[in-house]
């Protein structure tokens, strides 16, 4: 291939990137201009996909970590025909398909929403794990590569520690990462903030490390070829690139390697936009153009890819004909449909902690749902994800026949990896840790909600009843924070996250069914450490617990209640005990409502909502979190008993007494409400 046209194509990407930012009067041109050489060679020579079916499941994937470099991605995808020049002109504008940071759109070639730095390449690790999981079950014929692009900022983010460690430990040789090492960031040069040896660090993690001149086409080409031949390690290609490559000032002098070009149009940064466009071989009066020889280069690549895809599809057909049962299973995995599973056959132990009830369900999943991966951040025997692990095995370097990821202590990394697994497709992703450590995971949870990924979060040790570990490990404000995600809508108008806090073992089974059936948003399951008494049932507790699918339902009824008691989780059982006193001492008519999900409840019709929580009946709420957690259900005229401070270190039954989570206090508080 002519290096002249290769360089012209990279310059075309630089021109389009700079022009997009200039026209929008907003954006980040410098990094995009420096990284253009790598993406150009990757997309014209190495990245395999089907141009006629961009979502073909066995395609190579490209994950962009630094979302601010979106002009580079949009430009290279435009050269391949996935965006129009008009799309590029509308960069960062209302209603455009080219937002400031890429938002997942695989039909156009955007594999991930690029969020805070570090998450993109960690999602790529997840996608690479997903590929190995599927290959272990269906064969190497479907093997494909995951490429990712990271910047200096992404390398500095703490999440890169977990991603680098795990990818190396698992020997993900299907993962190739280009590190755009231009030594410039927004406010400083990198040597002002770090002196680490990145190559040595990744080598210590077990990566194949290649260092090249990152704007040299031949060097890039050679490095990718070397990475493709690597059999046992992920590869990082450290490309020493030039920020703002090609930028010049009004007098024509060099304006490369300037911090100012990181996050503003070239004109504002101190460069001359028109002189830069001319310097790169473009027309300053018409920068939004694709050079004819570059268009031809990409057209030839598209033609080659279509021929390649036809061959791969033929290989798949041959394999499917020879393996009809496996082929049917693979189709079912890739469909994204809810797996068939009989939840009524799950036998729960009476009075179990909901984390233990979850373990029972997970054990059944390990045997009955073959396309599920579960992970834990070094807490599998405490968050009870070991219910799943005990019926499969953990991934090991070279062996992905199991279905459990031992992530180690890295909650954010784990959550972001789950996002990558979900983005890849074909697999149900779930991960667990203590609820208090959800603080570490929220950036990835937010990304899952934004991307509408059905990741399942298993959060145990849900309240102050963690006990002796004390306030550092006792969630108080966490449920209120998380339930705000039920109020936040995604771009399809749905609640961005499904939050479920089941009240007993049978409700936990139902909660898991709701989680598995939710294929359009993340689901959070908030589970107890301590045992919980089973809620009363007229006939069959499991059958009655199915009403949890409506978000809130009555577990104890009376014809004309004087008061309605509302809670979720273990507090519901406490309300049952308090109701006994209210009935025995005062003859009060009491209704008790279990409300595992306010978000689901508010999706029901008004008639149902009024039937469960009629406006004209006084309501009392009990929560082990902040009172605001229940305010939407209890209303402004009701009363809520909750916590207003951090917890304390003591046995949980002592804390129940000291903090007022007793039948006697419930009785007293309800009497005060009705006085």
Briefly describe each language-model feature range.
Residues 151, 179-180, 239, 377, ...:
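Active-site flanking residues adjacent to catalytic metal/cofactor-binding acidic residues
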Residues 1-145, 295-526, 530-533, 594, ...:
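Thiamine diphosphate
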Residues 272-278, 293-297, 303:
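N-terminal hydrophobic/helix-forming segments and targeting peptides
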Residues 148-149, 177, 375, 620:
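Residue-level marker for buried hydrophobic side chains located in beta-strands
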Residues 154, 242, 380:
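Catalytic metal-binding/acid-base residues of hydrolase active sites
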Residues 126, 144-157:
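DG-centered beta-turn motif at the end of beta-strands
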Residues 147, 373, 564-566:
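Conserved beta-strand elements of the Class I
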């Amino acid at each position: 291939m002519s290096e002249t046209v290769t360089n012209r194509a990279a310059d075309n990407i630089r021109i389009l990137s700079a022009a997009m930012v200039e026209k929008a009067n907003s954006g980040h041109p410098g990094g995009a201009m420096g990284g253009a050489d790598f993406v150009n060679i990757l997309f014209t020579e190495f990245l395999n996909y089907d141009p006629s079916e961009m979502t073909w499941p066995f395609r190579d994937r490209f994950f962009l970590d630094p979302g601010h470099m979106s002009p580079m991605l949009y430009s290279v995808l435009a050269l391949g025909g996935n965006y129009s020049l008009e799309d590029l002109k509308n960069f960062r504008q209302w209603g455009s398909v080219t937002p400031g940071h890429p938002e997942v759109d695989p039909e156009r070639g955007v594999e991930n929403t690029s969020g805070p730095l570090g998450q993109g390449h960690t999602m790529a690790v997840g996608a690479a794990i997903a590929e190995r999981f599927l290959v272990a079950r269906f064969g190497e014929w479907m093997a494909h590569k995951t490429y990712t692009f990271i910047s200096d900022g992404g390398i500095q983010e703490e999440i890169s520690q977990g991603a680098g460690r795990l990818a190396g430990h698992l020997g993900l040789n299907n993962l190739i990462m280009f590190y755009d090492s231009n030594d410039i960031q927004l406010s400083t040069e990198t040597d002002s903030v770090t002196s680490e040896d990145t190559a040595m660090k990744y080598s210590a993690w077990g990566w194949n490390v290649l260092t090249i001149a990152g704007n040299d086409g031949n060097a890039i080409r050679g490095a990718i070829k070397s990475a493709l031949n690597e059999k046992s390690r992920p590869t990082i290609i450290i490309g020493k690139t030039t920020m703002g490559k090609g930028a010049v000032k009004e007098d024509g002098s060099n304006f490369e390697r300037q911090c100012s070009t990181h996050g503003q149009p070239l004109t504002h940064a101190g460069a001359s936009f028109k002189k830069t466009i001319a310097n790169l071989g473009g027309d300053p009066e018409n920068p939004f153009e694709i050079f004819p020889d570059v268009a031809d280069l990409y057209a030839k690549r598209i033609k080659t890819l279509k021929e390649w895809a036809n061959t791969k599809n033929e290989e798949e057909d041959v394999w499917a004909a020879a393996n009809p049962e496996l082929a049917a299973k693979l189709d079912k995995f890739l469909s994204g449909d809810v797996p068939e599973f009989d939840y009524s056959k799950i036998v729960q132990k009476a009075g179990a902690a909901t984390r233990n009830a979850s373990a029972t369900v997970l054990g059944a999943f390990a045997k009955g749902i073959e396309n599920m991966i579960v992970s834990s951040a070094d807490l599998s025997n405490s968050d009870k994800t070991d219910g799943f692990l005990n019926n499969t095995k953990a991934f090991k370097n070279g062996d992905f026949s199991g279905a459990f990821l031992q992530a180690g202590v890295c909650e954010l990394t784990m959550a972001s990896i789950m996002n990558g697994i979900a983005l890849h497709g074909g697999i149900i992703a779930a991960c667990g840790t203590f609820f208090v450590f959800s603080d570490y995971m929220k950036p990835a949870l937010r990304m899952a909600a934004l991307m509408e990924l059905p990741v399942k979060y298993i959060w145990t040790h849900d309240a102050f009843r963690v006990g002796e570990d004390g306030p550092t490990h006792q969630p108080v404000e966490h449920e209120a924070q998380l339930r705000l995600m039920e109020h936040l809508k995604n771009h399809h108008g749905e609640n961005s996250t499904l939050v479920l806090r089941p009240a007993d073992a049978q409700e936990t089974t139902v909660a898991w069914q709701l989680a598995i059936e939710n294929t359009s948003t993340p689901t959070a399951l908030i589970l107890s450490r301590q045992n919980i008494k089973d809620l009363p049932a007229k006939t069959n507790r499991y059958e009655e617990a199915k009403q949890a699918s409506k978000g809130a339902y009555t577990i104890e009824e009376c014809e004309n209640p004087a008061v309605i008691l509302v809670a979720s989780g273990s507090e519901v059982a406490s309300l049952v005990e308090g109701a006994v006193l209210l009935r025995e001492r005062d003859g009060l008519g009491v209704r008790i409502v279990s409300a595992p999900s306010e978000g689901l409840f508010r999706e029901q019709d008004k008639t149902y909502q009024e039937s469960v929580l009629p406006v004209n009946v006084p309501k009392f709420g009990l929560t082990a979190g902040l009172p605001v957690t229940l305010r939407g259900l209890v209303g402004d005229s009701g009363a809520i008993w909750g916590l207003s401070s951090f917890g304390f270190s003591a046995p949980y039954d002592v804390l129940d007494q000291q903090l007022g989570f007793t039948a006697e206090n419930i009785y007293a508080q309800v009497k005060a409400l009705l006085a």
